[in-house]
Structure formats: structure tokens, C-alpha cells
């Protein structure tokens, strides 16, 4: 499900809760994409319902969109929870990394860096919602595979799993 605003997120979670109640033996993996605005009351529901938070954290930046087109129209409390990666993670949600391609770059390195710094041309967007690089590596590997229901085939480097490897010229946890 694609949900940007807090009401859309709440209604999506309500729908997924209803689906789980009506089909308790279903192995369907539910996920919500984008999650720009999430009410803190909803954070624990992601874990409770097994809903994956599919986040495009390349957008978690202080720029004209977030500062001029969003901030004036929402409450201060709502504003402080834009792209609430850390809060969702701390509440036990599974964070999956994703792009918003073709609207933005599909390059995961950019999103991983952005998720940890949240820096933009107009400052930092809610630094307390930054998330560490290690968590973002899981988001773009194992957790993304879970969101696609491919975690039995891909995700971590493990015996019997498919893998695409790259060789890097630096320690990406220290860049």
C-alpha cells in the first residue's frame, strides 16, 4: 500500500488488521510504502501486525518541499515525525529500503547516507529520526527481500542463497 499522510497510514493499518482477523492463517506479507507522516500511536502497530515499513529515505531532507510545501500546513508534532525511521525501528518495525524510482534515484548508497544524516539544502530534517547505516544495510538487503517475499532466496550472505556481490574501495560504515 502507498501511504504518505498519517490518516492514510492509520487506515492502511486498520485494513491490514481487518485482513489478518479475517484470514488468520494467511502468510501474505503486508507493507506500507512512503510513510512520510506517521502518528506515533501507530508505531507499535507495524510490529504487532507484521507490516513492513517500506521507506524511501532519500526524501528525508530539509528542502523546499518539506520546509515550504509541508511544514506550514501540518502541526509541529506531525512535522517532527516526517519519515520516522528511528521511531519505527525502535518500536520493532521491520524497515525495508526502497527507491521512489523513476521520481528519484534508485541508488541505495544515496538513500543510506541520507537516512543517517537527513541533511539537505535547508538544514537537517528531524535529526532524531536518523537511523544508523547498519540498520539501513539490513533495510536494503534482508528486509527488502522480506518485503518481496524472497527472503528464502536472497537477502543476507548465507549458504544456499543467491547473491550479487560488489567490491568497495572504502569502509561504508565510516564514510
What are these model-derived regions, one by one?
Residues 5-8, 37:
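Short, internal active-site loops enriched in acidic
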Residues 7-30, 44, 55-174:
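His/Asp/Glu-enriched, well-ordered alpha-helical/loop segment
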Amino acid at each position: 500500500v502507498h501511504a504518505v499522510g498519517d490518516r492514510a497510514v492509520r487506515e492502511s493499518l486498520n485494513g491490514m488488521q481487518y485482513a489478518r482477523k479475517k484470514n488468520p492463517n494467511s502468510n501474505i506479507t503486508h507493507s506500507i510504502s512512503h510513510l512520510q507522516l506517521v502518528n506515533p500511536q501507530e508505531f507499535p502497530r507495524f510490529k504487532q501486525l507484521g507490516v513492513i515499513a517500506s521507506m524511501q529515505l532519500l526524501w528525508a531532507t530539509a528542502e523546499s518541499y518539506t520546509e515550504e510545501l509541508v511544514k506550514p500546513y501540518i502541526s509541529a508534532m506531525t512535522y517532527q515525525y516526517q519519515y520516522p525511521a528511528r521511531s519505527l525501528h525502535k518500536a520493532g518495525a521491520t524497515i525495508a529500503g526502497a527507491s521512489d524510482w523513476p521520481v528519484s534515484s534508485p541508488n541505495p548508497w544515496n538513500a543510506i547516507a541520507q537516512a543517517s544524516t537527513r541533511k539537505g539544502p535547508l538544514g537537517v530534517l528531524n535529526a532524531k529520526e536518523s537511523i544508523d547505516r547498519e540498520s539501513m544495510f539490513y533495510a536494503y538487503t534482508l528486509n527488502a527481500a522480506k518485503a518481496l517475499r524472497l527472503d528464502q532466496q536472497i537477502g543476507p550472505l548465507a549458504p544456499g542463497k543467491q547473491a550479487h556481490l560488489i567490491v568497495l574501495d572504502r569502509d561504508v560504515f565510516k564514510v
